[in-house]
Amino acid sequence: MHTPPEHSSISDGYSLSLGGLYWPRPYFPSRTERAALIGQSLPHWAIPTGNTAGWIWTGMGLPTPLTVLRPSTPALSPLEREHWRAREVRDSRHTVVDVAGQSILDPLSTEIELLSHGRDIDSAATQILFLRTLRELEGHPIATRMSPSQRERAHAVLQRVRELAERYPDITR
């Protein structure tokens, strides 16, 4: 929820509301600005993943609900773990990079997270479309480590990516 001055600024067109996050400028933020904006909204230990990381990389979809991973050490309190619903970073699956001082999953790890977790298939498909071409995604070895439900979701997302690529060939690479 925005404060009254923020709401007034948004209404007057001097700032933006990006999925509930306040951006104090009238233009859409660049990648480094998106990373900094998300960094202000997260605890210091949080690593954006899924739709949040996809939004930082592509600017497509919404960054909310904020999805994060947590480091193995130091361990978080059970209350904090429950509040953020943060899964643990796995070195075998996740590659973390730095964007404007914010740790974030790299594009390939973000794609795998979008394929296997989350709720919104359309948003995931759009973010994946801008992250990588479909040809590079299919048959990725990490896909073999997915559970049956994650694999089913991945197939639904990839089908939506194919539909988007056919419907909007001018935006595909």
What are these regions (language model features)?
Residues M1-Q150, Q159-R173:
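Short gly/ser-rich loop at a beta-strand->alpha-helix junction or flexible surface loop bordering the NTP-binding
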